[in-house]
Amino acid sequence: MFHVPLLIGGKPCSASDERTFERRSPLTGEVVSRVAAASLEDADAAVAAAQAAFPEWAALAPSERRARLLRAADLLEDRSSEFTAAASETGAAGNWYGFNVYLAAGMLREAAAMTTQIQGDVIPSNVPGSFAMAVRQPCGVVLGIAPWNAPVILGVRAVAMPLACGNTVVLKSSELSPFTHRLIGQVLHDAGLGDGVVNVISNAPQDAPAVVERLIANPAVRRVNFTGSTHVGRIIGELSARHLKPAVLELGGKAPFLVLDDADLDAAVEAAAFGAYFNQGQICMSTERLIVTAVADAFVEKLARKVATLRAGDPNDPQSVLGSLIDANAGQRIQVLVDDALAKGARQVVGGGLDGSIMQPMLLDQVTEEMRLYREESFGPVAVVLRGDGDEELLRLANDSEFGLSAAIFSRDVSRAMELAQRVDSGICHINGPTVHDEAQMPFGGVKSSGYGSFGSRASIEHFTQLRWLTIQNGPRHYPI
């Protein structure tokens, strides 16, 4: 069992009132983590520690910040086995957590490279003798709120670029992966970033609204970033706006996967299966809508054969490549969506079956607009086939969603696919590649109900720095009074 204290000012500590909560395995129900349940006073203390550490961290030479972040990346990889062991918190497969560590280490290295890429401008002034500059400076304390579904990647992403830009951070961990997020904080601290540069707060689930509001309202917190559901993201966005705190929000998705009539169907099937079912479909970029034209019958037949080879189950079983859902409630929620579609005429092509938190991958065909699965994010191992006639109809179906995070188009005619990609309402679109694709140096963000702002190295600089106008007056200046 993992014991998870808070990390405040470089020191592990219990909650001020000694309260704890438990995280249980979604597979066995056994206690996996016993976790400090932060009070409002603990939230204040974490921000105060970050604020106290800010001047020294911001004043470091960029090469020194780079060196410390690179050490953190190496240490993260060295402790990969500890992160993999923490997969028991979420029931995920070990290969998913291994991939998490690999990509998260890359994010730290990319952030390290950005410490010398924070640039300003010299701007011509209309005032004689005035030398005018636009400069970017660290903001102060940044609050990062990370989810459970890709806990290492998204926990590191919440803090890496804010740190590279010279800010200090408070990471509010997920109640469903608290040890994983606390371990990220420990790795960064052990890499020598400094006491208070990274602080980690965990809270009991029932305390989350009060703790988050307290953190956002704190005057020392200057920026907020949140990755999670659209429902909670709206609340975070409203709180941030109320307190005039700029926020980056990366929220839900219902990624469309367009298969044109000239597509390489074998390649499309492999990408669709990976995008729809990896990590049980619990990824914001997961392929949820397979939008297919004249080749639909052949594509569905090939994909059904692929899905039949995939198995969800105990992640310790080598045959269970998909792992578990986050809990049994998630399975019940998804099954309600599936049952609604089947009752309204959808066809279950292959798969299905729910046993607690284990849901077998499923493919549904003949899904139509009146079914909830047409619009609602399933966040599970369910993909639906939508049939259209021609490119314009496929594009209409792709854009007929409140979400707009990731998308994919498969076609042998790249020019044709690019013309469509430019009209898909999404922050990300991949041609002949899966919807699930992330790289540290790429701008990552959505549109519509998938949020606003972008993560990624250069894209993050604008958000996690303050743009200022500075002038130097050389020589006399005329004033009208």
From Swiss-Prot:
The keyword Hydrolase does not apply. Keywords: NAD, Oxidoreductase. The active site is at E250, C284. Belongs to the aldehyde dehydrogenase family. The lineage of its organism: Bacteria, Pseudomonadati, Pseudomonadota, Gammaproteobacteria, Pseudomonadales. InterPro entries: Ald_DH/histidinol_DH, Ald_DH_C, Ald_DH_CS_GLU, Ald_DH_N, Aldehyde_DH_dom. NAD(+) binds at G228, S229, T230, H231, V232, G233. It comes from the Bacteria. PROSITE patterns: ALDEHYDE_DEHYDR_GLU (PS00687). It catalyses: vanillin + NAD(+) + H2O = vanillate + NADH + 2 H(+). This is Vanillin dehydrogenase. One of its GO terms (molecular function) is vanillin dehydrogenase activity. It comes from Pseudomonas sp. (strain HR199 / DSM 7063).
